[in-house]
Curated annotation (Swiss-Prot):
Part of the 50S ribosomal subunit. Forms a bridge to the 30S subunit in the 70S ribosome. It holds the Pfam family Ribosomal_L2. HAMAP family: Ribosomal_uL2_B. This is Large ribosomal subunit protein uL2. The keyword Iron-sulfur does not apply. Residues 263-274 have a biased composition (Basic and acidic residues). Residues 45-59 have a biased composition (Basic residues). The lineage of its organism: Bacteria, Pseudomonadati, Pseudomonadota, Alphaproteobacteria, Rickettsiales. The keyword Methyltransferase does not apply. Keywords: Ribonucleoprotein, Ribosomal protein, RNA-binding, rRNA-binding. It comes from Wolbachia sp. subsp. Drosophila simulans (strain wRi).
Length: 274
């Protein structure tokens, strides 16, 4: 889609860079594939904050996305849409055989009129869904299942992909964007291609208000707090915190390993990140 730059006619537009939405549909989302979505504001069922910096934002309708791709037959791409709930774009697919529509994550390069299909005999083309055992080594895939039939769990954000780098018995070796090489059952499904909107990472919101529209609240530095609120808080005048950077709960940040030792999925990881 490309990027959209703004002339600095106001302080907030100076330096603002957004993703261009040229080519996206301006229609309302498919009503049969939407549902209400209530914002939690980062609170749990007790009303306590479990995720900081969440709250407010524009109202959103949730788009029901087909992450399992169990429907066989050819589908026609009707339009590419913006989804406020995720960074990638959506494609509305129409199946003429049974007059059913569904949303899928749009891969890069997909456009209205394209044909997609799911099944073991599908061609190796963006948007087609196959079992990993039927996809050639070296292919880029997204929407990858971790367990057969559970639906896609890996490589779903804008610009994300995984690469098939080899096979090992009933498993496929998959290199993730982090550099990690992981064993995935070859009976899991994956979709060919790279998720759309790779320029999402290059956007600059330009003003605090645009973050608030997205439901993101301000982040306060620990050194600006009181001692009761943060390990870096307090002190006379401006201080540097007086210790190595930690979270509000005293856990070292800046590179500390957070993965649990002896995790059951360790046996499926062939190479760590990097």
């Amino acid at each position: 889609m490309g990027m959209k730059f703004f002339n600095p006619v106001t302080p907030s537009s100076r330096g603002t860079v957004l993703v261009s939405k040229v080519g996206l549909s301006k229609d309302e989302p498919e009503k049969s594939l939407t549902s209400g979505k209530k914002s939690s504001g980062g609170r749990n069922n007790h009303g306590r904050i479990t995720t900081r910096h969440r709250g407010g934002g524009h109202k959103k309708k949730y788009r029901v996305i087909d992450f399992k791709r169990n429907r066989s037959g050819q589908g026609i791409v009707e339009k590419i849409e913006y989804d406020p709930n995720r960074s990638g774009f959506l494609a509305l697919i129409s199946y003429k055989e049974d007059d059913i529509k569904s949303y899928i994550l749009a891969p890069q390069g997909m456009k209205p009129g394209d044909v997609v299909t799911a099944g073991n005999d599908a061609d190796i083309l963006p948007g087609n869904c196959l079992l990993l055992k039927h996809i050639p080594v070296g292919s880029f895939v997204h929407n990858v299942e971790l367990k057969p039939g559970n639906g896609a769990a890996i490589a779903r954000a804008a610009g994300c992909y995984a690469q098939i780098v080899g096979r090992d018995g009933q498993y496929v070796l998959l290199r993730l964007r982090s550099g990690q090489i992981r064993l995935i059952l070859s009976s899991c499904k994956a979709t060919i291609g790279v998720v759309s909107n790779p320029d999402h990472k290059n956007r600059k919101l330009g003003k605090a208000g645009r973050s608030r529209w997205l439901g993101i609240r301000p982040t306060v530095r620990g050194v600006a707090m009181n001692p009761v609120d943060h390990p870096h808080g307090g002190g006379e005048g401006k201080t540097s915190g007086g210790r190595h950077p930690v979270t509000p709960w005293g856990v070292a940040t800046k590179g500390k390993k957070t993965r649990k030792r002896n995790k059951s999925s360790d046996k499926y990881i062939k190479q760590l990140k990097g």
